[in-house]
């Protein structure tokens, strides 16, 4: 699951399905060159989670909104989806959320210093995928945030691929 500011619409009741997939590949880590460009200095394997919410094929308008999950709380959250869910469903747009950052996958310190003892926040801080369900997410492998940009881009490229491997959007 993904944290949200509101419970969101009834996906099944509106002709949508929600599925999780593991996305794997090789990501590059970039450093800035003296002339302001980027240089891919090394690579590392990754396996992360993507969350796909899609309409029935007859409703699909061909558009996909992709969101980089926010991890400021120490867990994946989908702030953009919270605000646009109704419009996505109305228009027949698919949604893909990507666990792009290390904290969301493997855990770490939150950046907003949430209290974990207050009402409504218990269990929020540090609820990474591996922390929530170690068995389910045992195959996740995140090389670190320096690789996140290429992971995100690689997953989007794979989603756009209409040949070869089956797409989670199909």
Predicted regions and their residues:
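A general alpha-helical scaffold signature found inside nucleotide-binding enzyme cores
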Residues: 79, 83, 147-150
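Generic preference for hydrophobic/aromatic residues in regular secondary structure cores
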Residues: 9, 50, 137, 169-170
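Catalytic-loop region of hydrolases
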Residues: 1-82, 89
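Cap/lid segment of the alpha/beta-hydrolase catalytic domain
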Residues: 71-73, 89, 95-169
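Structural motif
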Residues: 63, 94-95
